[in-house]
Amino acid sequence: NLLIDIQKSMDELREEDWKDYEENIYPQKLLFDEPWLRYLIQYPKVWLDMPNTWERRKNQKVNDLPKSIDKDNYPNYYLRNFHHQTDGYLSDFSASIYDLQVDILFNGSANSMRRRILKPLKEGLLKFCNRKNSSIKILDVATGSGRTLKQLRGAFPKEKIIGLDLSDSYLKEASRHISDLDGDLIELIKGNAENLPFEDNSLQGVSCVYLFHELPRTIREKVLKEFFRVLEPGGILVLADSIQIIDSPNFISIMEGFYKNFHEPFYCDYIKDNIDSKMGEVGFNNVYSKSFFMTKVWSAIK
């Protein structure tokens, strides 16, 4: 029964989340970090925007983007209404309601799934424990509205954390989201994962959450090569994205529904793509993957 499988998987995710807190991977406050007041304010905006989403879905208007944007600044695969959402990723309005939309989609489990990157990242960075914490650099690629950055800062209070994204609007939302965090300011950079603005061997950790299913196959490979380039030897990559058919066959109907009901043109290819193999081909070692509810997490060492 699909509903039983879903509930069981969600329960296992919550148990994993609590266990990682008990192992001091991150502080307890992250477990109760949902911005309920902001969600309450944004909820009417989400509902009022739904007719626009339905209209785009019905008429397959997948390139309904703000006329003010300079399309030359973005790759073609990015210039679309992913999820049929208003303005794609290219407006302040889209950025302001995105987190709530994701939490509705995942039944409040989005942050728990994001936190699954923290344990492998923390374990991978232990090899640099003889260095000052402030000298360790962690880059979060496709940082979006900054939810992952907040999780990273909770687990890594003294390390240098950088968030990179293509969208000015989402970087602005990320800046708002992380403005009250303790510790050094997190640096935000506009940039493309295909051409990271960092020198070779300059980072110790790279995280990337929910990007790969929105990339064409050839671009996924290109981005993995960039991750490998910027990491120093011994550095760790932790990637989190949608589950795949190979390890979550009981959720195939959910994956198919996601592909059909949301505008996700690269998702059908993604759920069949052998990311583990691609990581090895790029040069990564110790590739490991595990699924948690609707999210699959990979870790790999340069």
Where are these regions (language model features)?
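A short glycine-rich, Lys/Arg-flanked "PGG" loop and its adjoining helix->strand segment in the class I
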Residues: E221-P233
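A short acidic, Gly/Pro-enriched loop at the edge of an enzyme's catalytic core
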Residues: E194-V206
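Conserved alpha-helix/loop element of class I SAM-dependent methyltransferases that forms part
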Residues: I97, G108-K132
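C-terminal alpha-helical "lid/dimerization" subdomain adjacent to the S-adenosyl-L-methionine
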Residues: E221, V238-V282, V287-S291
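N-terminal accessory segments
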Residues: N1-D72
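Class I SAM-dependent methyltransferase SAM/SAH-binding core
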Residues: L139, R147-N195
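A short SAM/SAH-binding and catalytic strip from SAM-dependent methyltransferases
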Residues: G205-T218
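Conserved class I S-adenosyl-L-methionine
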Residues: S134-G144
